[in-house]
């Protein structure tokens, strides 16, 4: 590295640090020289070393260097905070903050954005609330960069009212603040709120940019709001906003999430530039919409064109195999990942969940259970949840009970797992077990997630809950629904009441089923929809067996395509047949 006769200077060591910035072993050798020669006394070389270590992610060694420093400046504290946040080490970040306060070091305006991010990563609301008090105490609450991070923290904790209040209270909201708020709304599943604030942003004459467009197209994709999304995209083009490949990929994703696969394929073919995200988006979109063979064909084309797939691409491929019941193909693709020398293609928990879903949906429940037990990674709730869902579909009460016991122990507050187990018992007629599950939910304070459906009409999104009568056209909706139910009963429709409470009369069971949110959304769509145009319904949970059967009959009765996206996948109902082929 250095000739023994060469006299060392601070400048030479600085140049060496710059040349070795991405080489951990070299950096440690230079560190030893700095300490031995006494150049560490004024911290300047250690500062450069610390910055390099943070960039390469060696936070343990970075902390060692930091602790050697004599009264490090606030810039160095912030550098370490930044490194901890970037490397997902929130607890270490909070310990550093505690040390900072114990030593009486005063934070500056750049300190708190990192510490707030650390608390968001940690998911500790009480700690976040306390930190907010510190921010106010030190007088940084009005600064845009700090307030923006606090807003994002509250959104991630589900404290919508606090986040909105804080955002509205910001004296100056620049484009960065607006974009951050809109993005976190979408990331936390609050896309309707994102659209509402986008309209406020436009009303306040804040000029949006390509980052805004990406967030809003993503929001429209989540909501199934194709018309609104296209309006936003057209407006962006008219205002000469840079609709780069990131924007085009977001538009592509929106069409696929709205079930508009044919238009998405046209957009894909017309793209002047395509990257791995473009290809992966199409493959995942095809899989989600039940076009599994198209997804796998596109994957082959992608490889033939010399593009390297990433882990998202393989998620789409495995999902396609799962939705089509292609067990052998799925196993083959998963083996490709396992045997790959590319670390970026090592299977993640999401891929293992896809494999469990594939085996489970195909009725290979015991094989799926054994697969989980032999996994090299610790199975999370997503993986066990996939198996429990399969047990519910195939009505395997014994294995379902085993899996539910694991889930209730690890995630007692997630009501959907309790509900799935309850449905398994209900399907088997074990009503005493159903009562025990519901009693346990009450004891734990676990609540079932409220189901809702939405449908877009003339640039407005209409939401419906079960038995909802708050809609201005509620009377007409229920009249239309009654009319449809009478007609499809004559066609052979019989309400599936097996999972409805056992201690109510049959008439009440049928009434409860007939007022499910997706039925109300479909009835509204039939009233307002244009002839020849599909009805697009978005459901936040898995659609029930009865609503699935109802949708098939309605598509046949009215010759209207119904495109429904539930929690698991898309269902394209055409002429009495669903694209899922009863596999959901």
From Swiss-Prot:
Listed Gene3D superfamilies: Tetratricopeptide repeat domain
Gene Ontology CC terms: mitochondrion
Region (Type E(+) motif): 459-489
Region Type E motif: start-end pairs: 383-458
Feature: transit peptide: 1-20
First-listed, main subcellular location of the protein, grouped into a coarse class: mitochondrion
Keywords on record: Mitochondrion, Repeat, Transit peptide
PPR repeat locations: 73-107, 108-142, 143-173, 174-208, 209-243, 244-274, 275-309, 310-344, 348-378
Subcellular location: Mitochondrion
Chain intervals for the UniProt region annotation (Type DYW motif): 490-584
Keyword Transit peptide: yes
GO BP term (any one): RNA modification
Molecular function in Gene Ontology: RNA binding; zinc ion binding
Superkingdom of origin: Eukaryota
Family to which the UniProt record says this protein belongs: Belongs to the PPR family. PCMP-H subfamily.
Designated name of the protein: Pentatricopeptide repeat-containing protein At2g01510, mitochondrial
Originating organism: Arabidopsis thaliana (Mouse-ear cress)
